[in-house]
């Protein structure tokens, strides 16, 4: 995957480049994230990458084979992010956060909190009451599908990797997608975990709608002064 290289700037001026990648396979984007992280300097601006992936299951570093129940024809990729197995597919907003956490003076826990808070604030604008859990990263809502099911449902998953003091990977927010592939895994390693999406809760109906709000929320929380958007050709 070829990306335009931004002009570097003094590290004292927090800058953010937001790349709109459209729909892409997982592997080339992952390879590009690793290459970007390995080649960046102390003056390289941080980047957010907005993407929808072709259907894929990704295993995190803590992933266990028994949580892949019946992947079938959906490919499985062993990733280097934190966490366990999840599903990516069209209609899901994936936001990769390539942040120099040392320069931003953020701990990893603080960055995770920023991701969760940005999602919660975005959902609140649509009247969705969501929350984070200290023992299970991600964003959840009380399950409205009936008492016979789980008492809560997961809307968003998180997984990060830190290399050279910089983050890559990020978050996945279910927006308006086919949810059945989640039934073929134990999402994030939890058997029977209920999954839901914003379109089923009266929230954003499209990835474009969701990402505009979420990017703005997260950029504000981290404290960027200048934000530049660019669309990348596939």
Curated annotation (Swiss-Prot):
Q: Kindly list the places in or outside the cell where this protein is found, as annotated in its UniProt entry.
A: Cytoplasm
- One protein family per Pfam: LplA-B_cat
Q: What is its main location?
A: cytoplasm
Q: Name one GO cellular component term.
A: cytoplasm
GO terms under biological process: protein modification process
Top-level taxonomic group: Bacteria
Which chain positions carry the site (Lowers pKa of active site Cys)? Answer: 154
Q: What is its EC number?
A: 2.3.1.181
Q: In which pathway does it act?
A: Protein modification; protein lipoylation via endogenous pathway; protein N(6)-(lipoyl)lysine from octanoyl-[acyl-carrier-protein]: step 1/2
For molecular function, the Gene Ontology terms on record are: lipoyl(octanoyl) transferase activity
Explain the purpose of this protein: Catalyzes the transfer of endogenously produced octanoic acid from octanoyl-acyl-carrier-protein onto the lipoyl domains of lipoate-dependent enzymes. Lipoyl-ACP can also act as a substrate although octanoyl-ACP is likely to be the physiological substrate.
**Family affiliation:** Belongs to the LipB family.
Name listed for the protein in its UniProt record: Octanoyltransferase
Q: Which organism is it from?
A: Aeromonas hydrophila subsp. hydrophila (strain ATCC 7966 / DSM 30187 / BCRC 13018 / CCUG 14551 / JCM 1027 / KCTC 2358 / NCIMB 9240 / NCTC 8049)
Q: Which gene is the coding source of this polypeptide chain?
A: lipB
């Amino acid at each position: 995957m070829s990306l335009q290289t931004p002009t570097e700037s003094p590290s004292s001026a927090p800058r953010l480049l937001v790349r709109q990648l459209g729909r892409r396979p997982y592997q080339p984007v992952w390879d590009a994230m690793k290459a970007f992280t390995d080649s960046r300097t102390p003056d390289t601006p941080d980047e957010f990458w907005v993407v929808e992936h072709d259907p894929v299951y990704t295993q995190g570093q803590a992933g266990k084979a028994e949580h892949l129940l019946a992947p079938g024809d959906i490919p499985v990729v062993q990733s280097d992010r934190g966490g366990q197995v999840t599903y990516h597919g069209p209609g899901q907003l994936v936001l990769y956060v390539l942040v120099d956490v040392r320069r931003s003076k953020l701990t990893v826990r603080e960055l995770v909190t920023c991701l969760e808070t940005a999602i919660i604030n975005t959902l609140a604008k649509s009247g969705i009451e969501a929350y984070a859990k200290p023992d299970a990263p991600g964003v959840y809502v009380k399950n409205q599908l009936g008492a016979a099911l789980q008492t809560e449902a997961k809307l968003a998953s998180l997984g990060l990797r830190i290399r050279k003091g910089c983050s890559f990977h990020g978050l996945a927010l279910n927006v308006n997608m086919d949810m059945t592939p989640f039934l073929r895994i134990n999402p994030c390693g939890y058997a029977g975990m209920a999954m839901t999406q914003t379109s089923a809760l009266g929230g954003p109906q499209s990835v474009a709608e969701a990402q505009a709000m979420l990017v703005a929320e997260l950029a504000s929380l981290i404290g960027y002064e200048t934000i530049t958007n660019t669309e990348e050709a596939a």
